[in-house]
Design a protein with these regions (language model features):
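Cysteine-cluster motifs in flexible loop/terminal segments that predominantly coordinate metals
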Residues: 6, 27-32, 263, 269-296, ...
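Short acidic, Pro/Gly- and aromatic-enriched capping/linker segments at domain boundaries
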Residues: 8-22
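Short amphipathic alpha-helical segments and their helix-coil junctions
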Residues: 11, 30-43, 187, 193-197, ...
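Nuclease catalytic cores
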Residues: 21-69, 128, 155-156, 353-363
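Short loop/turn segments at secondary-structure transitions that flank enzyme active sites
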Residues: 31, 40, 63, 67, ...
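A non-catalytic, helix-rich entry segment at domain boundaries
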Residues: 59-155, 161
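Surface-exposed helix-capping loop/turn segments at secondary-structure junctions
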Residues: 67-76, 145, 220-227, 335-351
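Mg2+/Mn2+-dependent nuclease catalytic core
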Residues: 149-329
Length: 394
């Protein structure tokens, strides 16, 4: 995008913002103040499996892609370290996926019994078992596509100013790669979630995060003598473990359990599954073996997409322009929030169930609305903590 295509109407007090900062301010300026001015966070907990499993898988995935880039000589930037969770280990950038999966066992063993139960309730399997399973399945699912991809960078930091605004955006891209067949550079975002819902190409085109990342990485690509990113890719992975198949007395697969993948099915019936039959004398008993029809069903794109899904979406300069204008406008609002917070000790609040129901700062916010912003409020009494001292206030 050329400077003449960028928003220039507003000159904003210099702001340096991430996508997360912008979206939180859009949700509620007061919540933004708690996080980015006061430096508050939710108190650390051993029981955040949805977030922490995603961090562990991202770490194994990053190690895998870095190794591919090194082996093929396409990697432009080395990653110094790979992080897992707040309470988990940090690895050197040269770590292997196998080492990360092995370390997850030590992490799992250190969790308290209550925390492990919470993990099992949500994930369906112990962390090490699920991580090993999903990583193996992910590699197998995308092995053919991976041959067509030249890994350029992993967890790549970018920073770029929106011309004429005083706003600098920055962030980290999960992966930058070159599609060898299409001859284009692609920015990829990896997301883990409990289950994979239906996501359309339009939904992903309107996801400003990765579209902005493609724009932000254009100068880096130029330094690497590569063209600007032409597309963004989404790599979606289901976190929750597959169920174990069940069999009826008659030796048929139970219709009550269908939420399993091919690997789980084949492992389950590898040695045969005995069934007692419907006759009292046991004459109808037998052993269930893998069915070709079930294997074909589980290998079908429709079923596989319930566990792993990828989409490629073109970068639109007009869409990027719209997102940049929106980002600049939000940063203008952020500048005003800083002034109001400095003068009054609080920011505007977006009241409403959607904004407040699941807000991590809701209890503190309610207390300050009653007692005023100038009182003494210990964060730990509201399930919060201060971030580390290096917090920049941005």
């Amino acid at each position: 995008m050329s400077p003449t295509q960028c928003p220039e109407e507003d000159v904003i007090t210099a702001e340096k913002a991430t996508y997360s900062s912008i979206t939180l301010h859009r949700r509620c300026p007061q919540a933004w103040k708690y996080r980015y001015i006061d430096g508050l966070r939710r108190a650390r907990s051993e029981s955040t499996p949805a977030l922490d499993f995603g961090s562990w898988f991202h770490a194994a995935r990053a190690a895998d892609r870095l190794a591919k880039g090194r082996a093929e000589g396409t990697l432009k930037v080395e990653l110094e370290e790979i992080q897992t969770t707040d309470t988990g280990p940090t690895f050197p950038g040269t770590v292997s996926p196998a080492e990360i999966i092995s370390a997850s066992q030590d992490y799992w063993d250190r969790l308290g019994e209550t925390a492990r139960e919470t993990w099992l309730d949500w994930l369906g399997q112990p962390l090490p078992q699920r991580l090993a399973h999903i990583y193996a399945e992910w590699r197998e699912r995308w092995a053919e596509e991976s041959e067509n991809e030249a890994v350029i960078a992993v967890e790549q930091r970018w920073e770029r100013e929106i011309p004429g605004t005083g706003v600098t955006l920055w962030g980290y891209a999960d992966e930058v790669y070159q599609d060898r067949k299409r001859g284009i550079v692609v920015v990829r975002d990896c997301k883990t979630s409990g289950t994979l819902g239906q996501v359309t190409s339009l939904d992903e085109m309107m996801d400003s995060q990765v579209q902005l990342y493609a724009w932000g990485l254009s100068p880096d690509c130029a330094e690497w003598s590569l063209p600007a990113p032409r597309a963004v890719a989404f790599d979606r992975v289901r976190s929750k473990a597959p169920k174990t198949p069940k069999i009826t007395k008659a030796g048929k697969l139970s219709a009550s359990v269908k939420d399993y993948d091919l690997r789980t099915y084949l492992d389950w019936c590898a040695d045969g599954v005995p069934f007692e039959g419907m006759k009292k004398d046991g004459s109808a008993a037998g052993t269930y073996m893998a069915e070709e029809a079930e294997i074909e069903r589980l290998a079908s794109p429709q079923v596989v997409s319930q566990w792993f899904a990828r989409h490629l979406t073109p970068v639109s300069r007009y869409l990027v322009r719209s997102h940049l204008q929106a980002a600049a406008d939000t940063c203008s609002d952020i500048s005003r929030t800083r002034v109001r917070a400095d003068r009054r000790g609080e920011a505007p609040r977006n009241f409403g169930k959607a904004a407040c129901q699941f807000c991590e700062f809701a209890d503190l916010c309610r207390a300050q609305m009653v007692g005023g912003p100038g009182g003494e409020y210990a964060p730990e009494e509201y399930g919060l903590r201060y971030r580390d001292p290096s917090h920049s206030g941005r």
